[in-house]
Amino acid sequence: MKTILLFLLFCGLFSIQQARAQNGPNFQNDTATVNKFITAPLDEVLDEFAATYKIRFIFDRAQMHKYGVSDHYFHDKVKDIIRGICRANDIYYAKQPDGTYFILEKPEDITRLRRLPPGAMKPTVEAKINQAFTEEVITTAAAARPVRTNFALAGRVTDNATGESLPSASIKIRGTNITAVTNTDGYFNLTNVPADTSVLIVSYAGYQTSAERLTPERASQKLVISMLPADNALTEVVINGEKGEAVMNTDTRRVSVVQLTPAKLAVLPNIGERDILRAFQLMPGISGSNESSSGAYVRGGTPDQNLVLFDGFTVYQVDHLYGFYSAFNVNAVKDVQMYKGGFSAKFGGRLSSVTDITGKDGNKKTAGFGVDLSLLSVNIYGETPLNDKSSLLFSLRRSYQGPLYNKIFNKLTNTTTATTGGGGFGGPGGRGGMANFQTQVSSWFYDLNGKYTYTPDDKNIFSLSFYSGKDKMDNSHDLGIPSVLSSSVNSSSITDLTTYGNVGSSAKWSRRWTDKLYANTLVSYSNFFSHRNRGMASSITDSTGTVVDTNSGSAENNNLKDLSAKSDWELNISNTGKILFGGFASRQDVKYDYTQNDTTKLIDQNNQALTLGGYAELEQNFGALRLTPGLRYTHYDLTNKNYIEPRFSASYAINDKLMLKAATGRFYQFTNRVVREDILSGSKDFWVLANGSSIPVGSAIHYILGASYETNKFLFSIEGYYKRLSDLTEYSLRQTGTGGMFNPNSTITLEQNFYNGKGYAKGIEFLVQKKVGQYTGWIGYTLASAFNKFDVYGTDYFPAAQDVRNEFKSINLYQEGRWTFSATWIYASGRPYTAPVGSYTINRAGSGTETYFVVSGKNTERFKAYHRLDAAITYDLIRTSTKKVGSIGFSFFNIYNRSNTWYREYSIQGNQVISTDVNYLGFTPNLTLSLKW
C-alpha cells in the first residue's frame, strides 16, 4: 500500500509543472516587453516566458494546456500580458512578493500548489513557496458579476487581417453544450447563454482558436470576434494546432459534415494544382481512387448526385483536363463545406451529397496581390478595398503546355482516339492501326473569378459573384497512308476538338432585419456547355489515278441553362430554438443533339422545366439533445407532380467530449448526367432532365448513425450509413451499320436506350485525427458496398461501377519551423467492370463480315487493387518574423510508380479477345512557387 501511495504521489507531482529558475529569488523580470505574435497552448507560453524573461511560474500543466493564447503583442509588458491572458480565459493569477506567479484555474487551487512537499520544487524556490500568501488574487470574474442570465446573443466572426466574414465557424460556450455555427455571412446566434460573463470558444478551420470572455457591456452590444489565421504563427513560439488549424475539420455536432481550409491546401501533395475537391477525397466515405475525376464519389454515389454550389449558383462542370483537376481556384475560395449525407432541407435536387463553396469577398483593409506558378499553370489573383464599405476580388488561372500538362493530355488522348470502330460491348467494331501521325496539339484550360461586395451598414450586405471556366482539347492531326494502287500517298485530316465549361453568376442581398431574424436573397445563373466535333477529310487515289475527296464526321452538343432565385430565412424563436425557412424557383433549359455529316440529326433533345418549392426546418435544443426536423416541398412541371422530402437529424452530447448523432431523409433529383456505355464514341456524359417516363425522377432515402469522441488533441469518429436508391437511369447508344468517319459511303443508325433501375449503398466509416502539435494528420477507413439492379441485365443486383469495398487513407503532416512535410497513402480495393469473354462473326450479304463481343455478366470482374504514395515538401518564405509572403513547394505523385488500372481496352485478333490495361499516371513530380504582396 505504501508503494502505491508513493507512486500516486509521484504521478500527481509529475503533472504539476513550474518554470525553471536560474539562481536566487531576485531574477524576476515581468516588466520586460514582448513584441511578436504568439500562438500556443498556455502552458507552453508560460514555459517560453520563464526561459526568456527569467520568471518563475507555478501551475498545473494538465489544466493550463486546455487554454490557448493567440495574440499579437506590440511592446507589451509581460505582467500585462499575463493579466490579459487570464482575463480572456476566465482564469486566475497570483503574484507572490518574490515575483513568483501562480496560474490557477480556480482560486482554491493555490492551496494545493502551495502544499507540495519540498522535493517537488527546486531548492532555490522552496523557502519562498512556504512563505505566507499575502498577495491579491486577480481576475475579472471576481470584479464583474453577471447582469443577465439565460439570454440570446448575436454576433459576427471575421478575419482579423482582411475583415472578411468567416462562414461555418464554430462557437461554443465554455463548460456547456451550447453551440452555434456562423451562417454564410459570418453571423451567429447563441441561445440560452448562461451569463453575460461567459467565455466563448471560437474555432474555424485554418484559424487559431480564440477564447472570448463576455462582459455585461460587451454582451449588450453587437459582438464582433476577429480571428487570426494559423499561418501567422511564425514566431519563436510555434505550436501547430489548436482545434481549427487543421486542413480538414469534422463538425462533431452536425451529421456527416466536413470542413476544408483552402488556404492550407498547399501543404498536401498534389498532381499539379491545389485542389479543393481532391482534398475531400482524402476523407473516409469519399472515394480517393478516381484519378480521372475530381468529382466526388460520396458513399456509393456518383459525381452528378453531388450538388456543387459556388456563392449560391450551381456548378455543373466541376473539373478541368478530363477530370484531373477541379474547376475551382483556391485563391478565390474562402470556405468549403461538404455534407456527405442526411443534409438539411435547405438543400435539394441531388441524391447523395452537397458541396457548398463560399468565395472570398476581398480584403476590406488593405490591397493584396499574388501569383502561383507550377509546371501546369499560372495563377494570379488580387483583392482590394474600394472604400470603407466595399471590396473587390479577382483571380485568373490558365494552363500552359508544359511537361506536366502534356504528360496528362497525352495519357488521355493516346487512349481515346486510335479506334476504327464505334461499337461498344454488343456492337461492332475493333481497334485498328494508323500511320504517320502529324499532330498540332492546341489545348488549354482557364478559369476566372470575380466578386464585388458592398456593406452599406451593419444590417445589409450586397455581393455580385462571377465565374467562368473552359477547357479546349484539340487532338486534331493529319494522317498519311501510302496508296497500294499508285505511288501517291492517301492523306486524311482528322478533326478531334472538344470544348466544355461552365459560366455562373449570382447577385445576393443579405439583411439582418432584427437580432432574431436574418435573410439571404439570391438570384443566380449557370450555363454548362459541351461541344465535340469529330471528322475526317480524306483524299484517296483510286485505281485509275483519280483523286476522290470525301468528308465525314459527327458533332455532339450539350447545353444546360439554369436561371434560379431563392430566399433563405433564419428566425430565432426562443433561447433554445430557431426556424430555417425559405423558397426557391428554377428554370432549366437543356439541349442535346448528335449530328452526322453536318446534315443528319440522329439525336435532337430540347427540354425545359420549371421547379418551384419551399422548405422549413426547426433546430431545437433540449439541453444536451438537439433535434432538427425539416420538410422540403418541390413542384416539377415536366411531370406535373409534387415531391415531399422529410428530413430529420439529431445529436446528443453525453458529455463535452462524447457525441451521438443520427439523420434520415428523402431526397429527389430532377437533373441527371447520364454516362455513355461506350465512352470512346463521343462525349463521356451529358446532362438531361427527368421526364417521368424514360428518365424518371430519381429518389433516395438516407439512414445515418454515428458517434464521435473529441479531446484537445484527438478526434475519434465512426459513422454508418445505408442509402436506398430508386429510379436510377443508365444510357446506351447502340450503333447499327458500319458508317461513320471511317466509312463515309455508308450510313449509321443510332438507337437510344434509357434503362431504369434501383440500388442501394451501405458502409461504415472510421476516422482518427490528430489535431495538435508539430505532427498532425488522420487515418480513415471505409468498408462499403454499392449495388444496382436493372431489369435489362437480369433479376439480380450487381456491383455498381463505383463500388469499392475497402478504402484506407493515411494523411501525415509535420511542421518544423518554416518547413512542412506531408505524405499521403491511399489503398482501395479494385473497381468492378464488365469484360468480353469471347466473340462471334456474322456474314452479311454483300457487306462482308462483322465481329461482335460476347460479354460477361454486368460488372462481375474487378480490377486489381489501387494504391499510391504521395509526398510534398513546403518551405514558407518570410519577410519578417510574423509575415508570410509565399512558399516553395515540391510535390511527388505516385512515388513508387504504381501501375493502377484506369480501364481496359479490348480488340479481336483471330476471334481471340485481346485486353490491354490503360493505367493512371505513374510517378509525377511538380514544383510550385507562390508569392503574395
Where are these regions (language model features)?
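Short, acidic, small-residue-rich periplasmic hinge/interaction motif at the N-terminus
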Residues: 46, 89, 98, 105-150, ...
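Transmembrane beta-barrel wall of Gram-negative outer-membrane proteins
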Residues: 376-400, 415-475, 500-518, 573-577
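C-terminal beta-signal and adjacent terminal beta-strands/loops
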Residues: 401-403, 407, 413, 724-727, ...
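Surface-exposed extracellular loop regions of Gram-negative outer-membrane beta-barrel proteins
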Residues: 529, 637, 657-702, 722-748, ...
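Gram-negative outer-membrane beta-barrel transporters
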Residues: 722-724, 744-837
